[in-house]
């Protein structure tokens, strides 16, 4: 079906009193992303020409959090109902476009459902998203005559008979821009709440002989709103369960789907294995046969084929070539790069550092602002001293270097190919190729030495 141009209005003016938070409700996160951002992303994926965000409480925080989005900001200074919110956005509606109304606290609405709603909207009429609930208490009821939608009655305004209706309004609808503006201008606040209800446009459309078509979402969770942290946590579990199911069906082995969190996008190869309590954040790529141990956090990183990440390792903004091994308890910070077959062991931290092919950093080491060649062995307790309190400097270590334990490399410094650094050395000058650098104080020995003894 050929669709008209479409713009989206997202209502996000509510304070969210029941969240007990200084943060606007729609900025609370689900799967690591603000609820309203999920809705904005859906609108953009649907091809919205414009996204109008109606805001009120916490406007500065909203603008700061969503500054990278191409949004039209619409202020609703007083929260006088959904109809009033739409009235604030109405001056921006084009007559020949469709207007889709969404909510910033309904984060799991799917693009597929919205596209079906868009396709179902009759010419000159309204497409309405509805669901049937066993217990519809508190929701606006869909009224029908001979099967046709005639209106929506809010729960507080409904008669006892109307309250028996199980089909309820989700609040999501689509209509033509010119029609929407005309109906919005006719709204009144003559109701129990003293508010302007967007739902009243359904009756107005019916009175004009316009067709109203109801569409149901694929899943109830798509239209569930969030008013408190309990509801948010429940939707988080729903979302994570859905993501885990998709990954399992795509061939990823999740040892316990209930203990896996995806807070971004995961691209993966074949035969990937992920143990319990792993968190994936941002954009992550896992190659073929990657294994991730329990308790790991992987963020905005690329992990090559046949890599193994042992338990409780944190990898952020890093790149690993094939067949690397990391951890347990390792930390790769932004700018860390491991070439093929490199090894980073327990309690090793890397930042803005490259580790060459086959090189090994076994344990208890910090490598920052460093470039390390191939087949290098870094002993335990090695530190690149890259910061003088004001500026950072680089350490360069050539191929086939052996660095003994408890070595400090005071940058800027270069260690030539094939050099050896003796254990306990503080390197302050460049070391030539194949040279031995040693700076230990000569050992002295006193025979028959007795330790002092405390007097009783």
UniProtKB/Swiss-Prot annotation:
Catalyzes the last two sequential reactions in the de novo biosynthetic pathway for UDP-N-acetylglucosamine (UDP-GlcNAc). The C-terminal domain catalyzes the transfer of acetyl group from acetyl coenzyme A to glucosamine-1-phosphate (GlcN-1-P) to produce N-acetylglucosamine-1-phosphate (GlcNAc-1-P), which is converted into UDP-GlcNAc by the transfer of uridine 5-monophosphate (from uridine 5-triphosphate), a reaction catalyzed by the N-terminal domain. In the N-terminal section; belongs to the N-acetylglucosamine-1-phosphate uridyltransferase family. Residues 1-229 are annotated as: Pyrophosphorylase. The keyword Repeat applies. One of its GO terms (molecular function) is magnesium ion binding. It is an enzyme of class 2 (transferase). GO terms for biological process: cell morphogenesis; cell wall organization; lipid A biosynthetic process; peptidoglycan biosynthetic process; regulation of cell shape; UDP-N-acetylglucosamine biosynthetic process. Pathway: Nucleotide-sugar biosynthesis; UDP-N-acetyl-alpha-D-glucosamine biosynthesis; N-acetyl-alpha-D-glucosamine 1-phosphate from alpha-D-glucosamine 6-phosphate (route II): step 2/2; Nucleotide-sugar biosynthesis; UDP-N-acetyl-alpha-D-glucosamine biosynthesis; UDP-N-acetyl-alpha-D-glucosamine from N-acetyl-alpha-D-glucosamine 1-phosphate: step 1/1; Bacterial outer membrane biogenesis; LPS lipid A biosynthesis. Keywords: Acyltransferase, Cell shape, Cell wall biogenesis/degradation, Cytoplasm, Magnesium, Metal-binding, Multifunctional enzyme, Nucleotidyltransferase, Peptidoglycan synthesis, Repeat, Transferase. Mg(2+) binds at residues 105, 227. SUPFAM superfamilies: Nucleotide-diphospho-sugar transferases, Trimeric LpxA-like enzymes. Binds 1 Mg(2+) ion per subunit. Its cofactor is Mg(2+). It catalyses: alpha-D-glucosamine 1-phosphate + acetyl-CoA = N-acetyl-alpha-D-glucosamine 1-phosphate + CoA + H(+); N-acetyl-alpha-D-glucosamine 1-phosphate + UTP + H(+) = UDP-N-acetyl-alpha-D-glucosamine + diphosphate. CDD domains: GT2_GlmU_N_bac, LbH_GlmU_C. Homotrimer. Residues 251-456 are annotated as: N-acetyltransferase. Residues 230-250 are annotated as: Linker. UDP-N-acetyl-alpha-D-glucosamine binds at residues 11-14, 25, 76, 81-82, 103-105, 140, 154, 169, 227, 333, 351, 366, 377. One of its GO terms (cellular component) is cytoplasm. Acetyl-CoA binds at residues 380, 386-387, 405, 423, 440. The active site is at residue 363. It is found in: Cytoplasm. This is Bifunctional protein GlmU. Its EC number is 2.7.7.23, 2.3.1.157.
